[in-house]
Swiss-Prot record:
Pfam families reported in the protein's UniProt record: Ribosomal_L11 (PF00298), Ribosomal_L11_N (PF03946)
Protein name: Large ribosomal subunit protein uL11
GO molecular function, one term: structural constituent of ribosome
Family to which this protein belongs: Belongs to the universal ribosomal protein uL11 family.
Function field: Forms part of the ribosomal stalk which helps the ribosome interact with GTP-bound translation factors.
The UniProt record lists the keyword Ribosomal protein: yes
Record PTM text: One or more lysine residues are methylated.
GO biological process, alphabetically ordered: translation
GO cellular component: cytosolic large ribosomal subunit
């Protein structure tokens, strides 16, 4: 018999730095899940990623108080800010430009995110990420 799904929990946790403090502890604790078990499993799963990068995770909680989780790739906005060397996007992206990214940097970001993108090919994926960059106030070169 299949386990009954109780709920889905969506969080953004820094890679390799999951601990029982908020947001992980309260989100799992109120559903009766083992917090330390998740922290150890998540940290092991994200050990190959750069420590500190926010990593989206979707936790499936079952009615018997067990869980499974799936990690996604780091959000494009975080990768774009890192590539451009800025701390935040522009408040007025069409008038104030805060940084520059090259096509090569966009292709590297697409390689990181390719599992989560729905684009048909590399060119379409690069255009998608370039649109995100422009909406943050970054200039796309190349």
């Amino acid at each position: 018999m299949a386990r009954k799904i109780n709920c889905y929990i969506k969080l953004q946790v820094k890679a390799g730095q999951a601990n029982p403090a908020p947001p992980v502890g309260p989100a799992l604790g109120q559903r009766g899940l083992n917090i330390m078990e998740f922290c150890k499993a998540f940290n092991a799963a994200t050990s190959k990623l750069e420590p500190g990068l926010p990593t989206p995770v979707i936790i499936t909680a079952y009615s018997d108080r067990t869980f499974t989780f799936v990690t996604k790739s780091t959000p494009a906005s975080v990768l774009l800010k890192k590539a451009a060397g800025v701390t935040s996007g522009s408040k007025r992206p069409n008038t104030d430009k805060v940084g520059k990214v090259t096509r090569k940097q966009l292709e590297e970001i697409v390689k990181v995110k390719e599992a989560d993108l729905t684009a048909a090919d590399l060119e379409a994926a690069v255009r998608t990420i370039a649109g995100s960059a422009r909406s943050m106030g970054l200039t796309v070169e190349g």
